[in-house]
């Protein structure tokens, strides 16, 4: 306390002695305050004992929040806490972002080392043994031989199945390449109805799920499954046993079905492509024998042809065809008759009589005989033709008038108030 009081009295005495030194004392007080703040921050940092990166590295592996990893190409998800492996492919063009390169997602893993090894295998497949990876290349000698015969997509799909026995725990952004495989790479045949389900079979770490799905497609001979529950048309002469039958009889039926399928598969030639066995369908020789033994068997087409609806349809079609044929015959006969008439008789042109109303009573009629036009065509056209009154020119009308008619008659035109025209002869 004495030291504090003595230090406090020092500035006061200096301030009192120096009358004009108030500005210098305020600067020293501000500097001392900054020094105290710096010492407090430094002391708090020493008490923490480590930086932010060191504290993140000391976090337990089960807690989420650590996003970095010590391995190349591996990050930790912020919320799930799983390790995700990514690969940056620079050889492709990203159309969505319009730039070169895209990120290849290799899956999410519970183990950090498994994610790192998945990245190593993908990098070796993309860029070869000379690329930078997390572990030595000698650890992947066997994998380098296997990846030579696979494409990039196929090898990336195989990484999620058995990468060193550590499969991916989650792959929500990918789909299976083979039919019948889900995201967990379990082969199933759920489309086939029945009490039993094929996906109840458990697989080992080294089993190939895709080939197992192909084996299921060949009726799964070694699985002891009663196929008669799925195939209703199993056989023509086989009687289905009730569900209350004993287990021994069911096993016997399964074995019989298996032996029948095996015999059908062995009869096929090795050079021919594989075909599914036609269960319940007879071969060519058996079909002929059955036709000989049962000649009265009728097909679906024969039954349909004997139905009344089919017969009525046939009658309608026949009636329509007959009516069309009759119409065609009548038209042909008419054409023949018309052609004969045209060839036997000369075509006579009708003579049209033209008349002009003259006062409603008298009319100037023309004879019905045809007048030749030779005199009109050969005569010179030296006339006083008027477009308003063409009747005033006698030369134009001379060839058309009969020999007994007078040429001095004139016709006058009068216009009425109703805008109708009437022609009146000149009074004599």
UniProtKB/Swiss-Prot annotation:
Gene Ontology CC terms, in alphabetical order: nucleus
Any GO MF annotation of the entry: DNA binding
Main location: nucleus
Keywords tagged on the record: Activator, DNA-binding, Ethylene signaling pathway, Nucleus, Transcription, Transcription regulation
Region of interest (Disordered), ranges: 1-28
UniProt subcellular location: Nucleus
A Gene Ontology biological process term: ethylene-activated signaling pathway
Known DNA-binding region: 70-136
Gene3D superfamilies: AP2/ERF domain
Pfam families the UniProt entry points to: AP2
SUPFAM superfamilies: DNA-binding domain
Composition bias, Polar residues: 1-10
Function (record text): Probably acts as a transcriptional activator. Binds to the GCC-box pathogenesis-related promoter element. May be involved in the regulation of gene expression by stress factors and by components of stress signal transduction pathways.
Family affiliation: Belongs to the AP2/ERF transcription factor family. AP2 subfamily.
Name recorded for this polypeptide: AP2-like ethylene-responsive transcription factor At2g41710
């Amino acid at each position: 306390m004495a030291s504090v009081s003595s230090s406090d009295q020092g500035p006061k005495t200096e301030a009192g002695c120096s009358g004009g030194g108030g500005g210098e004392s305020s600067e020293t007080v501000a500097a001392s305050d900054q020094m105290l703040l710096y010492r407090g921050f430094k002391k708090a940092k020493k008490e923490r004992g480590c930086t932010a990166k060191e504290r993140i590295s000391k976090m337990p592996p089960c807690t989420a929040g650590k996003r970095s990893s010590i391995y190349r190409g591996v990050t930790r998800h912020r919320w799930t806490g799983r390790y995700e492996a990514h690969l940056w492919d620079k050889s492709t063009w990203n159309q969505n972002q319009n730039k070169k390169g895209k990120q290849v997602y290799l899956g999410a893993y519970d183990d950090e080392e498994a994610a790192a090894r998945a990245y190593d295998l993908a990098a070796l497949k993309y860029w070869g043994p000379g690329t930078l990876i997390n572990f030595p290349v000698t650890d992947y000698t066997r994998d380098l031989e296997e990846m030579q015969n696979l494409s990039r997509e196929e090898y990336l799909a195989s990484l999620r199945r058995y990468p060193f026995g550590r499969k991916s725990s989650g792959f929500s952004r990918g789909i299976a390449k083979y039919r019948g495989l889900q995201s967990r790479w379990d082969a199933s045949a759920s489309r086939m109805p029945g009490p039993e389900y094929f996906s109840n079979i458990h697989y080992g770490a080294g089993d190939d799920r895709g080939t197992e799905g192909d084996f299921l497609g060949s009726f799964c001979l070694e699985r002891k499954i009663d196929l008669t529950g799925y195939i209703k048309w199993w056989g023509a002469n086989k009687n289905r046993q009730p569900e209350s039958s004993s287990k021994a009889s069911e096993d016997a039926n399964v074995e019989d079905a298996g032996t029948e399928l095996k015999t059908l598969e062995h009869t096929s030639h090795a050079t021919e492509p594989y075909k599914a066995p036609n269960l319940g369908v007879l071969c060519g020789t058996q079909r002929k024998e059955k036709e000989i033994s049962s000649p009265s068997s009728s097909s679906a087409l024969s039954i349909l042809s004997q139905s009344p609806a089919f017969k009525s349809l046939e009658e309608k079609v026949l009636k329509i065809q007959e009516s069309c044929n009759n119409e065609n015959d009548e038209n042909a006969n008419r054409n023949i008759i018309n052609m004969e008439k045209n060839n036997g008789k000369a075509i006579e042109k009708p003579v049209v009589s033209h008349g002009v109303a003259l006062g409603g009573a008298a009319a100037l009629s023309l004879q019905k005989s045809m007048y030749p036009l030779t005199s009109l065509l050969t005569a010179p056209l030296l006339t006083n033709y008027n477009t308003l009154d063409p009747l005033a020119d006698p030369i134009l009308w001379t060839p058309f008038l009969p020999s007994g008619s007078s040429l001095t008659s004139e016709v006058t035109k009068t216009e009425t108030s109703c805008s109708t025209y009437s022609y009146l002869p000149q009074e004599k």
